[in-house]
UniProtKB/Swiss-Prot annotation:
Alphabetical list of Gene3D superfamilies matching this protein: MFS general substrate transporter like domains
Assembly, per entry: Interacts with isoform 2 of BSG; this interaction is required for its localization to the plasma membrane.
Biological role stated in the UniProt entry: Functions as a transporter for creatine and as well for its precursor guanidinoacetate. Transport of creatine and GAA is independent of resting membrane potential and extracellular Na(+), Cl(-), or pH. Contributes to the process of creatine biosynthesis and distribution.
UniProt similarity note: Belongs to the major facilitator superfamily. Monocarboxylate porter (TC 2.A.1.13) family.
Tissues where this protein is expressed: Highly expressed in the lung, liver, kidney, and pancreas. Expressed in eye lens.
Localization (cell): Cell membrane; Basolateral cell membrane
Natural source organism: Mus musculus (Mouse)
Protein name per Swiss-Prot or TrEMBL: Monocarboxylate transporter 12
GO MF, one example: creatine transmembrane transporter activity
A biological-process GO annotation: creatinine metabolic process
Encoding gene per record: Slc16a12
Keywords: Cell membrane, Membrane, Transmembrane, Transmembrane helix
Amino acid sequence: MTKITRVSLASPPDGGWGWMIVAGCFLVTICTRAVTRCISIFFVEFQTYFAQDYSQTAWIHSIVDCMTMLCAPLGSVVSNQLSCQAGIMLGGLLASTGFILGSFATSLKHLYLSLGVLTGLGFALCYSPAIAMVGKYFSRRKALAYGIAMSGSGIGTFILAPVVQLLIEQFSWRGALLILGGFVLNLCVCGALMRPITLKEDRSVPEKNHNRESQREDCKQASPYSPLTKECTETRLCCSLQQEYGFLLMSDFVVLAVSVLFMAYGCSPLFVYLVPYALSVGVSHHQAAFLMSILGVIDIVGNITFGWLTDRRCLKNYRYVCYLFAVALDGLCYLCLPMLQTFPLLVPFSCTFGYFDGAYVTLIPVVTAEIVGTTSLSSALGVVYFLHAVPYLVSPPIAGWLVDTTGSYTAAFLLCGFAMIFSSILLGFVRIVKRMKRTQVPFPVKDSDPKLQLWTNGSVAYSVARELDQKDEEPLPKARSGCNLT
């Protein structure tokens, strides 16, 4: 039998060095997510140089995104076993190596391996540990801190999109990749800022501590090859996994995970095909790149303002609803996109989509933290971003196949829009069902009285016991209001 004791090692400071952690995470999102978005600017160059179609070229962006999310649990494991600092520095070296090797590629397959697999693996070691570190330093102002940290994706896109286009024009796509390889080395600097912190947490402490101590001594004294040592090792591993990934059995987390699959499928293709779509409807190269910049700027506004708003007292308990609202509106934007075929119409689209994209991206770690708690946040975020992997991998090629097959972007954009709307509806429906179940207040009844039946609408209970009794007995005097049925 065990009892839970609170071991207060440190509380989230909600400031201090935490703001340096926010700055480090801000730079990590620039070097990972913003750079990943800007890879789509290379697509026209890749198609021309390698003479390939949309679906083949789109695999590069898909593999980068897929590896970043697929290996997110690996990033959590490395940061937990070694340190967040070591994991991010190692990831920066791998990502830079991928860009540099990609600049010497002679085929798309070389880009798949270097720019796709190697760079994506490096980004995975950096992204989820940096985001989880922000959650450990902030509690009361968590949404605002995440809003600032995640705004690096939008700011980086705004700055890097025209810069990358200029680099391609001046130094060709090979020179641009080489320069980006040097740029992402800044991830090593970001890793140096991630000072670890120990939070207060619940720990299960046995009432008879001498039993555990005796077991530990037996394990230490046993031979390394004895069955007792093997049993102790297996027990420690099982306990570690149960403590680290116990949230996987939570129903709320399972529903969130399923919803994330559809949301991730819908959100990725726009950053791949916005520039090619704009070019296909007659927008110039610089205007198409500027659309990505607008998307990035408004993404920043969505990150910060939604983070600040959901930290207010009036909305703090409705972060879940705000997340659903943002995802659904991005889906509606997708449905309208095929009707927007001029630059003046694509500008407000970029503003609207960018704002709500920044909004729900900010709230993903906040909603996850509310479900699993701060202690398991790093592992939970690793799983959440891992679930982005397959949708990120398949959605751009599927969209490219639809473009090649139908000759237009309409089917691809509609499919993405409906996927995001379904993601929002699924979470909302499950939340409503759970809320309805909670409002059904149980009332104690006597098993010996079969006539006593209670109906409830969540607030008022109605009894027909007296009416049933009156049928069997003589008419009773007028009952007082509020009489005791028992």
